[in-house]
Structures are given as structure tokens and as C-alpha cells.
């Protein structure tokens, strides 16, 4: 049984339907919020590219106030598909042996009842969209928001659906700038997805001089420069940049660890900001390679370190 079959409820046969209703045009207004059916605000804080052992080496004291840290595994090896997957409601998994995927999905979804502070969530209403922000907003009455650091997740992409606000931050590495934009309404719970870029290459804190960073493009940058990468003869012009040596790779690994330690102070500010009934998940969208088996980064890589991520959740008060 796949995810779609699990969520879909079997119903008795219905009489033949009339003409299909016109769908709401893309980019049109969202429907009104229903009355809220949950008590907890819910935040998913995604440390982009943060591999599990980097997090554990950093030993962030503030973040660990949420609860024990688990090693989990992401469903994808790079940012865009991993965030799409997170927004279906599937969090990084534990890779349990001798368990059917359908049984794992059921338990994962059932746990949202306690995360959101409600009972009997009607997951069947996620069919056919399979979109968790839609369930949160249009069934449970949440206000839904996203703050993203990486341009590959910008508001023009397909994941900007059923969000009341969706903002690409001015800088890719400044979680602290997200905090003043986060508002919590006493009339209804809020959902925030935070894509946090300090742990993404080049693992930079916001006060660093960007002119000193080496430049390696992600998918967004590749698209921007693709026309320049094709010569007049129609052949692809390959970049001759030399691969990082061991010393540089170790420096980059240390930078990611340092970024986690820096973010720990910012998370204290987040914890001070959120209201009492706020359930927070801290995790990553994928891991990162620092020279293992000749790999660097993430994306077209099949290696366990590209999928191992930290996972912790709970209420701060």
C-alpha cells in the first residue's frame, strides 16, 4: 500500500456526477479559514544541508532543550524534493526494518494529533492533493507561513501552495532576520516552515564577507548561467574548477559545525518568541559530503551521509 492508498478512504459508490466545477485559478485568492480545530502552533525548522554528525559535534545546548536527538534519514538528497516531501507531512524517517511502508506512514501521520494538539485528524481530506499545508489551513484552521533562505524554494516555485504568506529572505544565511516577520494570532494556531541557510554551502554566518566565499552553483544558479555554458558550436563548456583538496574539505566541514553553534543562539531567540503551545521540529532536508568516497556536497550522490540528518521535536514550554 502506497501513501496515496493509505490516505484515501474507501467510500460507497456515488451517483454519476454532473459537470465538474471550475477550479480556482492558479494564483487566485485562498478560501476563508475555517474555525480552528487544533491548539498548538507548529514550526518545522529545517537546517539546510546539516548532516547528523555535524550537528552532534556542534552539541547545540539550546536546540537540545526540545528533546533527545535522533539520527533519521531523508527521502531525498537535495533541497527542492526534500522540502516537497516534508510538505506532504512526511518527516525524515527512522528506516525501520521488517515494516511495510504503509505501516510507517500511518504511525508518522497519527503522531500529528499530539504535535498539533488535536484528535481525530481527517487525513482523508488530503486526497487527492497530498498537501499538508492545505490540510492545516483549510481543514484545521491554521494560518500557514513559509520563510525560505534558498532561491531554489522561491515563492514562484510549486511548493508555494496553501500558504497565507511565503517569503524568500533577502539573504540566504540569516535566520535571525526571519524572527521579526513571525506573528502568532491568538484567534487561530500558526504553522511556519523555516528553511535555514547558514548550514548550507558555504556555511556562512550573516556577518561574513561574501567576497571570500568560493562559488559553486546550485540548481538555481545553474539555470541562470546555463545559456553561457553552451558554446557557439552547441557543445557544453565544462567548468575546469579544481576539486577541493582534503585540507579545504576539512575546513568546510568545520564551517558547517560552527554554523550550527552560531544558530544555537538564534534558536534561543526563537524559543523566547513563540507562544506557550508551540510544537517545534528541528531537522534537515538532507546531509552533506565532505570528501567521503570522492564526493562533496549533495544532490546527485548516493551515500549514507547525504541522507543522515538530525531530528528532534517537542515544546519548549
Where are the model-predicted features located?
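Catalytic domains that recognize anionic headgroups
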Residues: 1-317
Amino acid at each position: 500500500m502506497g501513501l496515496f492508498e493509505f490516505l484515501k478512504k474507501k467510500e460507497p459508490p456515488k451517483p454519476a456526477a454532473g459537470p465538474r466545477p471550475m477550479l480556482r485559478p492558479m494564483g487566485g485568492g485562498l478560501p476563508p479559514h475555517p474555525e480552528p480545530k487544533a491548539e498548538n502552533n507548529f514550526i518545522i525548522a529545517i537546517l539546510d544541508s546539516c548532516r547528523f554528525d555535524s550537528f552532534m559535534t556542534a552539541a547545540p545546548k539550546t536546540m537540545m532543550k526540545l528533546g533527545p536527538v535522533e539520527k533519521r534519514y531523508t527521502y531525498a538528497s537535495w533541497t527542492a524534493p526534500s522540502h516537497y516531501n516534508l510538505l506532504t507531512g512526511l518527516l525524515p524517517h527512522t528506516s525501520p526494518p521488517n515494516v511495510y511502508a504503509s505501516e510507517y506512514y500511518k504511525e508518522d501521520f497519527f503522531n500529528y494529533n499530539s504535535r498539533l494538539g488535536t484528535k481525530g485528524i481527517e487525513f482523508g481530506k488530503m486526497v487527492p492533493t497530498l498537501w499538508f499545508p492545505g490540510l492545516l489551513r483549510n481543514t484545521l484552521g491554521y494560518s500557514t507561513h513559509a520563510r525560505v533562505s534558498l532561491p531554489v524554494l522561491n515563492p514562484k516555485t510549486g511548493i508555494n501552495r496553501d500558504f497565507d504568506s511565503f517569503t524568500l529572505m533577502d539573504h540566504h544565511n540569516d535566520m535571525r532576520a526571519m524572527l521579526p516577520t513571525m506573528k502568532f494570532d491568538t484567534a487561530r494556531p500558526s504553522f511556519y516552515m523555516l528553511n535555514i541557510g547558514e548550514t548550507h554551502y558555504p556555511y556562512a554566518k550573516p556577518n561574513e564577507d561574501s567576497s571570500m566565499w568560493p562559488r559553486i552553483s546550485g540548481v538555481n544558479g545553474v539555470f541562470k548561467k546555463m545559456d553561457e555554458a553552451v558554446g557557439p558550436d552547441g557543445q557544453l563548456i565544462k567548468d575546469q574548477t579544481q576539486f577541493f583538496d582534503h585540507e579545504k574539505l576539512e575546513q568546510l566541514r568545520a564551517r558547517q559545525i560552527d554554523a550550527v553553534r552560531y544558530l544555537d543562539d538564534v534558536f534561543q531567540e526563537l524559543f523566547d518568541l513563540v507562544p506557550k503551545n508551540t510544537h517545534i521540529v528541528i531537522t534537515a532536508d538532507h546531509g552533506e559530503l565532505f570528501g567521503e568516497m570522492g564526493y562533496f556536497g549533495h544532490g546527485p550522490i548516493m551515500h549514507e551521509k547525504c541522507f543522515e540528518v538530525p531530528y528532534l521535536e517537542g515544546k519548549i514550554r
